[in-house]
């Protein structure tokens, strides 16, 4: 399954397309917040 943010999974593992992932993170801090349990940007 491709999650559309550079992360995609098959039956065995998940992988990250870092170029896509990084571009999405730069444009969408919500994605990073989801991956970090909501801690991104909260200092």
Swiss-Prot record:
Remains active between pH 2 and 10. Disulfide bonds join 9-14. It comes from Weissella paramesenteroides. One of its GO terms (cellular component) is extracellular region. Highly active against Gram-positive bacteria M.flavus strain ATCC 400, M.luteus strain CECT241, C.soprogenes strain NCTC533, L.monocytogenes strain ATCC 19111, L.inocua strain ATCC BAA-680D and S.carnosus strain LMG13564. Remains active after incubation at 121 degrees Celsius for 1 hour. It is found in: Secreted. Keywords: Antibiotic, Antimicrobial, Bacteriocin, Disulfide bond, Secreted. GO terms for biological process: defense response to Gram-positive bacterium; killing of cells of another organism. PROSITE patterns: BACTERIOCIN_IIA. Pfam families: Bacteriocin_II. This is Bacteriocin weissellin-A. It comes from the Bacteria. InterPro entries: Bacteriocin_IIa (IPR002633), Bacteriocin_IIa_CS (IPR023384), Bacteriocin_IIa_dom_sf (IPR023388). Belongs to the bacteriocin class IIA/YGNGV family.
